[in-house]
Structures are given as structure tokens and as C-alpha cells.
């Protein structure tokens, strides 16, 4: 059985990196990053194993004598251990960049044992560090990199991201007309992959994911040689079901969302993740198609989605350009969905006790 790991940089991530020489070679230079110990304790409780991996330029040379390094490093390790933070391994590259060694990050020689088959849970393992080389190491290992920063991605934030439930769902819908495969990750952004065979529809689905702040993968094979009806309808049904499943018991979600974005088009969207499917829709189009998408299928898509997602959805748009009118509906729905699915606690947002 594979194991989830965190491969964590030392200087600038676990402990502060002295700006004058970037070396922790005296005891008075040793300072821990804010909240690092509580975060690591929580991450261990969630099943992560910890590996420290660090480049220490010229370790063992006059540039960084071994004895100068060992004192602060050993004290750091003793403090971590005394608080219950345990590292499975400490991996150190002692070379200078110009040595062209095989073990310096972002090269992978030091982590080869974890890259063997059946060791690493790559979907739930991460490299955490403050430099671009840490992210490159993650890419080389085939896992996700997180760039630590006190202001934008500090230890409490990293801990929250890695310990919250991964709201994910996978739905397959196979009929005589279509084969639809949908995956959604509500707590991950970017990297959506969408292919329905209808190019403009792909673009619209990407608007939902982008403005909704989540990731989805959609693959559809259908009877487009007839028209786009079954492809759009069944994609809406499958996506709605996937969103409903990914939301789980809905505890902590905002439940409601409302947006009124005004650009060339005025689009209105109100959403209630109510458990009751209903659609109110108002949009008029000049032409029968936008790109390769039938404009009449826009309403049908949202009706199908609201039915399987079991939500109450109100959509309305006004404007002069059909392309922009259609896009405004998908964009407004995405922004509204972002509000409604956001988790802000653990209470069920219903006086009835059920959604």
C-alpha cells in the first residue's frame, strides 16, 4: 500500500534563512518559521510522513564547516523531536551548484527509494519549499509542489489545504447515444481538461471550472453526426450528479450564491443548493448557434444540471451579442457556484437538518 509523504525543504521553509549569507552556521541564527511545529503535528496526525530534503552548499568545506552546521542542525532536530515532529529521513546534498552532482535539488537521486513502484502515493504527496527548485523537484517526482511563503502560503494555510477533505467525485454516464466521463475536484484549481466534441461548449464548461474555483475533467463521445442535443444534455446530467456527489453531506458550505456581473452583458445568477431541483431561465438569442453550440441547448444544459445536482437555479442575461450572452451565463454560474460550495465551518446550513 502506498504512503503519502511530504518532502520539505529546510532553510527558508522549516527554519528561517539568514539573508546575510543564507547559512545557519551559528546557534543565534536558528529560528523556526511561524507555526511550523503545530502544522507538522497536524499533518502527521492526518497520516503524512515527513522527509527533510535540503541543499547545503559546500557542507564540509571551509565555506560551511561540518561542525558549524551540526550544532544548530542537531538542536533543530532535537526541538522537533521533543514536540513530536519526526522525520523519516533527512536528505542533504553537500555540493556546490557548479559541482554538477546528481543529488542536488531539483535532481532526484536522493529521493529514488521513494520513487520505486508501490512506495509513494503520488496523488497525495507534496514537495514543500520556498524556491523554484523545490517546485522543479516536485515536477521531476511526478507530485505536486507547494511554494512556501510567509505572506501568501504560510504553514497554517498549507496545513488547512492538505488536511481538509478532498471533495471529489467521478461519474460515468453511458447510453445508446453518448459516453460521458466526468471528474470534479472542488478543492483544487486549474488543470481542467475538457473534451466534448463541441468546441464552444468545451470553452463554456471551462468558464464554469475557472470561475467556480475547482477542477474538472470531462470526456464525451456522442452522436454529433446527428446534432449536439444528447452530448450537451448528458454532459449536464453527469456534471450535475458529480457536483452533488462531491459536495457530500454539504456540512459547512455557504449553500447560497448570487452574482450580478456587468460587462457588455448583464447576467444574473442566484443559486440555492437546496436539494430541490428547479430552474428559472431567461435569455433570448438572435441566432440558432454560437460557434458549434446550439443556443437552445444552453437552457437545456442548465436544466439537466440543476435536476441531477438538486439545486434551485435562477439565470438571466441581457446583451447584444449572442457569444457574450451565452458566456455571461456560464461565467455567472461559475462565480455563484464558487460562493455556494465554499466551506466556512461544519454546520449544515438548513433549519430542517437535511439538504
From Swiss-Prot:
Residues holding Zn(2+): 93, 95, 101, 103
UniProt binding sites for Mg(2+): 9, 11, 130
Cofactor: Mg(2+); Zn(2+)
The family this protein is said to belong to: In the N-terminal section; belongs to the histidinol-phosphatase family.
Subcellular location: Cytoplasm
HAMAP family with a match to the protein in the record: Bifunc_HisB (MF_01022), HisB (MF_00076)
Annotated region described as Histidinol-phosphatase, given as residue ranges: 1-166
Region (Imidazoleglycerol-phosphate dehydratase): 167-355
Keywords, sorted A to Z: Amino-acid biosynthesis, Cytoplasm, Histidine biosynthesis, Hydrolase, Lyase, Magnesium, Metal-binding, Multifunctional enzyme, Zinc
Single GO BP term: L-histidine biosynthetic process
Annotated catalysed reactions: D-erythro-1-(imidazol-4-yl)glycerol 3-phosphate = 3-(imidazol-4-yl)-2-oxopropyl phosphate + H2O; L-histidinol phosphate + H2O = L-histidinol + phosphate
Location, primary (coarse class): cytoplasm
Pathway as given in its UniProt record: Amino-acid biosynthesis; L-histidine biosynthesis; L-histidine from 5-phospho-alpha-D-ribose 1-diphosphate: step 6/9; Amino-acid biosynthesis; L-histidine biosynthesis; L-histidine from 5-phospho-alpha-D-ribose 1-diphosphate: step 8/9
Superkingdom classification of source: Bacteria
Catalytic-site annotation from UniProt: 9, 11
Molecular functions (GO terms): histidinol-phosphatase activity; imidazoleglycerol-phosphate dehydratase activity; metal ion binding
CC annotations in GO: cytoplasm
Organism from which the protein derives: Klebsiella pneumoniae subsp. pneumoniae (strain ATCC 700721 / MGH 78578)
EC number: 3.1.3.15, 4.2.1.19
Official protein name in the record: Histidine biosynthesis bifunctional protein HisB
